[in-house]
Amino acid sequence: MSRQSFCLYLHGFLSSPLSKKAQQTIEFCNRSERRSQICVPEIKNGPVDTIKELRTIIDVHKGMDIMLIGSSLGGFYATFLSEEYDLPAVLINPAVRPFDARESLLGEHRNYYSDTIHSVTEDHLDELLQLERSPLMNPDNFWVLLQTGDEVLDYRLAVEKHGEKIA
């Protein structure tokens, strides 16, 4: 008998569980043959607090087949967690080095969905740097989906980190 599946979807910076990608993933998991459980937490804290919360979610579901899906900054977090827990991860236009985007990230930003204001500090960028995992210990755990026309993220950084694989 196979174990139940659990999917942890991590949205991007200033996004939400209400995003189109998150909602499509929820819909897919709910109607798939395996009827995977899915969790799409709202990521609204700094990096250290976010990782602490995500570790708790993973630890609660350890008896299940866990997979990660991360988009943008959620892809960065999924990379860290995949390496830490040796879990498969699908990354959608992942942020690869978000700590290098100091000028565009520092300061206050309005969430697209909730209108909540998020403040990004130097400490947050330093926390992101501490989460960097290179080189990857388990590169075969990743399936990376890239779009070349992303206005914010340079897909070439993801190709450099994860390699080019034709699937």
Spans of features found by a protein language model:
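Active-site catalytic motif of lipid deacylating hydrolases and related acyltransferases
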Residues: R3-H61
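Short, flexible hinge/linker loops that cap or flank conserved catalytic cores
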Residues: M1-S2, L136
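The alpha/beta-hydrolase serine catalytic core
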Residues: P88-A167
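Aromatic pocket-lining residues of Rossmann-like dinucleotide-binding sites
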Residues: L81-Y85
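Short acidic/histidine-rich motifs immediately flanking catalytic phosphotransfer sites
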Residues: K62-M67
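Gly/Ala-rich beta-loop-alpha elbow adjacent to hydrolase catalytic centers
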Residues: L68-A78
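Short glycine-/acidic-enriched loop or helix-start segments at secondary-structure transitions
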Residues: S19-K20, Y77-F80, A101, D154-R156
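Short hydrophobic segments within beta-strands
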Residues: Y9-F13, I69, L145-Q147
